[in-house]
């Protein structure tokens, strides 16, 4: 459980089951979860999980969750810049160009950091690029000049690498057509579906 010590499993639009070190500790709504009261206890457990891993492995690669620039949640953030600060880790900022607005997203994410946290960001990776990379090459230079941080790479959009999605939001965009002559399997999209990645093998 040290690889994912704190897990949220949505149970409604506003509440989620909180799983700490592999054991459910109750359901909390979003407001209750992000309140400072009790937050430090969760932080201690998350940090302790990192310490156990750091004692056994080097290097350790950590993945944040969501955006690093939700400044209204900065004081209670457990997984992004505060975790990098605790671990003394350098940060790579990964930007999704497929959704559009990548320049505003990257620049805003960098500039909304505190000066100390901004120094931790050592590189930018542009993810899910489609099209002719030559058209984006001037944009790479612009991004580096705007942010003062090197763009380390541009990752093409791959459709066949089968990496698990971060959360269930992606399910809203999954639409498959029935194929004649093959066994077709349909999965009902329930509003608060949990463990949805169990069905990934059926897509292949």
How would you describe each model-predicted region?
Residues 1-204:
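Flexible phosphate-sensing "switch/lid" loops adjacent to ATP/NTP-binding sites
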